[in-house]
Amino acid sequence: VMLAYTFSNLSSALMSNLGLIVFTYTFGLGSGRIALVVGVQFLFAILSQKPWAALSARRGKRYALAAGFIMSVAGGLYFCALVLLRDRVGDSPLAFMPFSVLAGSGIGALFTLPLAMVADTVDLDEAAGGERIEGTYFGALTFAYKFSQAAALVLIGLALDLAGFDSSLAAQGRGTVLALGLLLGLGASVSFGAAALVLRGYGLDEAAVQANRARIRALRGGGE
């Protein structure tokens, strides 16, 4: 869970930070249109919470979170297509709506499911007769989040250098804007894909979660 959380937060940080540069220089979007694209993305991140909760209850948290990551990968690949077709896309915000819906909904799974999966791991420890160490687990998630944000800043700096970005110029070269757009789309897709792959190591399904909770109730009842 920690590795998946790191990779997915890295992708999210790339989209939110490098994305503003790409929207401005690659597509020529103004601040109002950028706000619309990003606003729709956040809206679907919020609206997706109930569907993700329903899917996790039916198929398990790992399945739901992996589905969210795959949606984000699809959003990143669609973004790459927009970059390649940027001359046709222009600065129309409507062309970005599928990206906003896919990426926003996918990132929505990141908001709650990893935390719930860590809580299930804490229950597993207690059910096995161990101690509850919530502080250790959630502290590790906090570290993973901060590490991913710091790593994103380093990667963005490298991407800008590799693409030949010059902040003193009002307009960047065609090769530069193409490279920045593809680095963002492909980089985010690869990172979300890696997050989905490492989730394969998480073995708690909903049946195991319910069994652990029943075991905990029995242990606590016996100690009273």
Protein language model features and the residues they cover:
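Membrane-embedded alpha-helical bundles of multi-pass transporters/translocases
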Residues: 1-224
